[in-house]
Amino acid sequence: MSDHSHKENTPSNFIRAIIEKNLAQNLYVNKKWGGSPGDAKHHDKGNVDIAKIRTRFPPEPNGYLHIGHAKSIFLNFELAKDFNGVCHLRFDDTNPEKETEEYVKSIKDNVSWLGFDWSGHEYHASNYFDFMFEAAKSLISSGHAYVDQQSADEIKENRGTLTSPGKNSPWRDYDIGYHLNLFNEMREGKHKDGSMVVRAKIDMASPNINLRDPAIYRIKNIQHHSTGNKWCIYPMYTFAHPIEDALERVTHSICTLEFEDQRPFYDWVLERLKENSLLDDPLPKQHEFARLNLTYVVLSKRRLIELVENKF
């Protein structure tokens, strides 16, 4: 686990200070924007981005927003405004189980009600599924990912603990062609839910458990609210998130402290895909802030859904 104590003494405007420093260093002066999200080749054909920075508010459309989300909304939109940038409204719809168009509409209404305009920059993670599939294949091809046929319980048991290393999967070192074939079979719907997952190949002895070969793709034979039955495999959020940021040319990926331990994996994904020529610099950087906690206030999507459904 990370020690968050250093965050408590960090100035409240530390993200603003980071942005000012990045701009003074001219980190984004040659950053190109292809007019829409895309890979390295797409943006290379574009012009220099007129947006000095790009941020995003990335809710998952699996419930109603609560007051806790307002902090992230204000932070991302106001920072973009103050630094002559753009804030994207992105729906992280990578898990089809509980996501619906009703929540998409509700979230858009809430953001508008707060007075913010995403100016045509509304994006959906599901629009990037084709790229994410190719990205996962690229990682397998370069020896940085594999298909694991262990059960979920076996994977959990072999992950290790905070004080003991994990164990390599028996499938980890099978040849690349074997894993590519299995992944294509997963895509074609030839395997059942839970029978296998694609995992990043990093380090099962890492002191950061999030780097012990995390899953990046799983099988879910569920209809997606946007893509229908086109896909039966879906990317894990922690794999999809950095890719979405990079495709959208986000410069500052601002999230709550709970994702601090995930930052090394966020960077790992981007660096590997840059090595494979799918992404290019400047890559987005993740920055964390403390989440909003209030007493006597509902700060849970699940609880809000219960209140709405039961007409409270």
Q: How would you name each of these model-derived features?
A:
Residues P11-I19, L27-K108, Q223-T256:
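N-terminal catalytic cores of NTP/NDP-binding nucleotidyl/phosphoryl-transfer enzymes
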Residues Y64, L89, D93-N95, E101, ...:
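Active-site cores that bind ATP or allylic diphosphates and position pyrophosphate for catalysis
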Residues M1-Y64, G85-C87, R187-E188, S195, ...:
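Non-catalytic terminal extensions that flank enzyme cores
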Residues G34-G35, D92, Y123-H124, S151-A152:
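Proline- and acidic/polar-enriched loop/turn elements at helix boundaries
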Residues V48-A51, E134, N158:
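Active-site-proximal, well-structured secondary-structure segments within enzyme catalytic domains
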Residues Q25, E78-V86, N110-S119, A246, ...:
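Secondary-structure transition/capping motifs at alpha-helix termini
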Residues Y103-F129, A135-S138, G143-Y146:
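A glycine-rich helix N-cap at a beta->alpha junction
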Residues K21, E78, D109, K137, ...:
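Surface-exposed charge patches
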